[in-house]
């Protein structure tokens, strides 16, 4: 891995600590603590979930990359040729294949298929709480550190662009907002555009959940 073992990000905008040391070990510990304290009511559902609700299994990779002296999250923008979520910003991921027994298997396979990220190049740190989407998927986000830069090989039918956004920018409460949807108990999270890309919806919620878990969000 090309990521330094101990990376200090000194930014006054970080609420948890102005000189927070965001190491891989720290992030992994916070993810483990969050999952340990979860119960069945944790997570977020975009639809009412009843006893007879049939949910499809899915997983995404939340890729952490170290570049320019700071951590970034890596995203993709989907093409207009995919069946769903055309042109939207997302994490690499998708539905579970038959025979896959863990979210990690699904997330790493999808990342390899979509952006050419070899499974052995990802250092998995942990998982976030599950998210149930309006399309009836139960998504498990898998957080992993990736080498960067990287010789990505994108699946041209699915992925239009691969890009990163700094954690510092994502953690700034001035860059996103959450609002309740009309006639609904659900809310929507959306970010201001970054480098021409709009991060919103389920991917934005997973992003904010990750930032809350590691303690970098400011002001909210």
Outline where the language-model segments fall.
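NUDIX/MutT-family hydrolases
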Residues: 154-195
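N-terminal leader/linker segments that precede catalytic domains of diphosphate-processing enzymes
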Residues: 1-90, 95-113, 117-149, 180-220
